[in-house]
From Swiss-Prot:
One BP annotation, GO: cell wall organization
Signal peptide per UniProt: none
Taxon lineage: Bacteria, Pseudomonadati, Pseudomonadota, Betaproteobacteria, Neisseriales
Protein name from the UniProt record: D-alanine--D-alanine ligase B
Xref: PROSITE patterns: ATP_GRASP (PS50975), DALA_DALA_LIGASE_1 (PS00843), DALA_DALA_LIGASE_2 (PS00844)
SUPFAM superfamilies the UniProt entry points to: Glutathione synthetase ATP-binding domain-like (SSF56059), PreATP-grasp domain (SSF52440)
Enzyme class: ligase
Protein family membership: Belongs to the D-alanine--D-alanine ligase family.
EC number(s) stated in the UniProt entry for this protein: 6.3.2.4
The organism of origin for this protein: Chromobacterium violaceum (strain ATCC 12472 / DSM 30191 / JCM 1249 / CCUG 213 / NBRC 12614 / NCIMB 9131 / NCTC 9757 / MK)
Cystine bridges: none
Length: 303
């Protein structure tokens, strides 16, 4: 399609989520080509971003995951090159990649989040276990795909979970466990799509469950009552806007047994694999994967 020009699908990279990005990128590349788009794979771990200009690309479909591709670094470089790209800008990408600062912003805006504590080597781990109650989730602040996450179930295990998470990031958070159910809501442009309920066969929705297991159950529509579904979509859109997101993102949330919603995190470069959730939500609205890729590509911007 001439309207898009020559499109670079940025995929791979050198983060711990490289494998997932390559799977997502392969799907996007195939979909765009099937629609007549002059699309080409581009792995920034193999050549510099300056090659985008040198090779005559007109815009970028960013499907990199994790640090560099999703944390504002890439976005700043593309801005400097004057290269239009999909997804959030520099500020929103940087904030959303940082779970701690995301929580601070959402809390400041009055949006519901689980209780949490920032951990360091001097933390009173026993006191935090008592304060948050068990179980507790411990997470690196800037990793995605549940990498480095531990569910602490027994007293005295919090420090070890902190040490594990610190292998991936210097900033580590401990988060209150919310039972009841995990959900996600895709946002594209100004529209929040049908929520999805995630029912992992494993103890929680970890890396293997997200990308490789076939026994994770995804329910879309999620089965929420209409008024709760509307509330969830409204919160997802508010969360998206508070972070300054644009283009597309996916907002994850939890719901307790009483039906209260708690925002978890925002993913500004969602997966687009066969297991991924944004394509699933789009299908529920009658949007095929190939058309979804075009919808995302339509949001390219610079500045």
């Amino acid at each position: 399609m001439k309207q898009y020009g020559k499109v670079a699908v940025l995929m791979g990279g050198s983060s711990s989520e490289r494998e997932v990005s390559l799977m997502s990128g392969a799907g996007v590349l195939s979909a765009l080509r099937s629609k007549g788009v002059d699309a080409h794979g581009f792995d920034p771990s193999e050549k510099p971003l300056s090659a985008l200009k040198e090779e005559g690309f007109d815009c970028v479909f960013n499907i990199l995951h994790g640090p560099f591709g999703e944390d504002g670094t890439l976005q700043g470089a593309l801005e400097a090159l004057g290269m239009p790209y999909t997804g959030c800008g520099v500020m929103a990408s940087a904030i959303a990649m940082d779970k701690w600062r995301t929580k601070l912003l959402w809390k400041g805006a009055g949006l519901p989040i689980p209780a949490f504590e920032l951990l360091d080597e001097n933390s009173d781990f026993d006191a935090i276990e008592r304060q948050l109650g068990l179980p507790i989730f411990v997470k690196p602040s800037t990793e995605g795909s549940s990498i480095g996450v531990t569910k602490v179930k027994q007293p005295g295990e919090l420090r070890a979970a902190f040490e594990e998470a610190r292998k991936y990031d210097k900033v580590v958070i401990a988060e209150q466990f919310i039972g009841g159910g995990e959900y996600t809501c895709a946002v594209i442009g100004e529209t929040a799509y049908p929520t999805i309920k995630i029912e992992p066969a494993t103890e929680y929705y970890d890396y293997q469950a997200k990308y490789f297991r076939d026994d994770t159950v995804y329910r879309c529509p999620s089965g929420l009552a209409p008024e709760v579904e509307a509330r969830a979509r409204e919160l997802a859109l508010k969360a998206f806007k508070v972070l300054g997101c644009r283009g597309w993102s996916r907002v994850d949330f939890l719901m307790d047994e009483a039906g209260e919603i708690y925002l978890l995190e925002a993913n500004t470069s969602p997966g687009m694999t066969s297991h991924s959730l944004v394509p699933m939500a789009a299908r529920a609205e009658g949007i095929a994967y190939e058309d979804l890729c075009l919808k995302v590509l339509d949001t390219v911007h610079v500045g």
